[in-house]
A protein has these predicted regions:
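N-terminal active-site wall of soluble small-molecule enzyme domains
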Residues: 2-78, 84-89, 115-118
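Active-site beta-loop-alpha junctions enriched in small/polar residues
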Residues: 6, 33, 56, 82-84, ...
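Conserved strand-to-helix beginnings and helix N-cap segments that scaffold or border functional pockets
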Residues: 13-14, 63-64, 111-112, 140, ...
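Catalytic cores of alpha/beta
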Residues: 35-47, 84-93, 130, 134-153, ...
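Glycine-rich phosphate-binding active-site loops on the catalytic face of alpha/beta enzymes
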Residues: 42-62, 100-107, 147-166
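Short, conserved beta-strand edge motifs with alternating hydrophobic and charged residues
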Residues: 78-81, 99-101
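Catalytic-face loop-and-helix region of soluble metabolic enzyme cores
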Residues: 97-153
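C-terminal helical cap(s) of enzyme catalytic domains, especially alpha/beta-barrels
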Residues: 117-121, 144, 159-173
């Protein structure tokens, strides 16, 4: 379960994560701009199992230090990238889970071709996650053909009449 906790841009809240934790034993990703050390301790304290590190907003030292801190706190880390250069930077910390965000941060357009194009830069022993723009069966099939291990899906579930049924359907594909 991915939970937005960033308040200013995405209207998330740490209380949302606490509420989810009280109702579910599934792993929870804290989705936020993780730029301060205290956020990692807070993530652990509120029940997160994983955090998001966004390569585009961190320098190499921050990436390394935050990754190490998260692992010391026994938090999994999804390292988010947007292009070849960011993947190269991310690989320096040898992450177990690496994601490609299909949203262009400059103009906010989304194309799943980003996942296809960048897949070859991520070693097969990494968990490869496609992020953003996954809206229907066709998108799921396309990303499976791209050898994607997992998906980070938000809007499609939020807009679905029965998100649980949609998740089961896509998992079975």
């Amino acid at each position: 379960i991915s939970c937005l906790t960033e308040e200013d841009y995405f209207h998330g809240n740490v209380d949302y994560l606490k509420q989810i934790r009280s109702k579910s034993d599934l792993p929870i990703l804290r989705k936020d701009f993780m730029i301060e050390e205290y956020q990692f301790y807070e993530a652990k304290a509120i029940g997160a199992d994983a955090v998001l590190l966004i390569t585009a907003i961190l320098d190499d030292t921050q990436m390394h230090d935050f990754y190490q801190l998260a692992r010391e706190l026994e938090l999994d880390v999804l390292v988010e990238t947007h292009d070849e250069a960011e993947i190269e930077r991310a690989m320096k910390i040898d992450p177990r889970i690496i994601g490609v965000n299909n949203r262009n941060l400059k103009d906010f357009t989304i194309t799943l071709e980003t996942t296809r194009r960048l897949r070859r830069y991520v070693p097969e022993d990494k968990v490869f996650v496609a992020e953003s723009g996954i809206m229907d069966d066709e998108d799921v099939r396309f990303l499976r053909e791209c050898n994607t291990d997992a998906f980070l899906i938000g809007r499609a579930f939020m807009e679905a009449e029965t998100p649980k049924m949609l998740a089961k359907k896509w998992k079975a594909m």
